[in-house]
Amino acid sequence: MNVKESEPAQADLQASWMCAECGYIYDPAEGNLETNIRPGMPFDKLPDDWSCPVCNHPKNQFTKFISQL
């Protein structure tokens, strides 16, 4: 039997964005209903004046990371 190692399924990988100031995580799949950001909104499509809903740090202070579910 020949078993090939496979990379994690794309559905298992998710790009999220973390605030450098407070650690808040913006998950595009969840959006942020408190700030009227609908689920499915990619980070790069957020308004330029969007800021962290926890500490008000600007959007350009978020860093991208990929987590494996």
UniProtKB/Swiss-Prot annotation:
GO terms for molecular function: electron transfer activity; iron ion binding. Gene3D superfamilies: 2.20.28.10. Binds 1 Fe(3+) ion per subunit. It comes from the Bacteria. Keywords: Electron transport, Iron, Metal-binding, Transport. The keyword Transport applies. CDD domains: rubredoxin. It holds the Pfam family Rubredoxin. InterPro entries: Rubredoxin-like_dom, Rubredoxin_dom, Rubredoxin_ET. One of its GO terms (biological process) is alkane catabolic process. Signal peptide: none annotated. Its cofactor is Fe(3+). Fe cation binds at residues 19, 22, 52, 55. Residues 14-69 form the Rubredoxin-like domain. PROSITE patterns: RUBREDOXIN_LIKE. Monomer. Serves as an electron acceptor for pyruvate ferredoxin oxidoreductase (PFOR). Belongs to the rubredoxin family. This is Rubredoxin-1. It comes from Chlorobaculum tepidum (strain ATCC 49652 / DSM 12025 / NBRC 103806 / TLS) (Chlorobium tepidum).
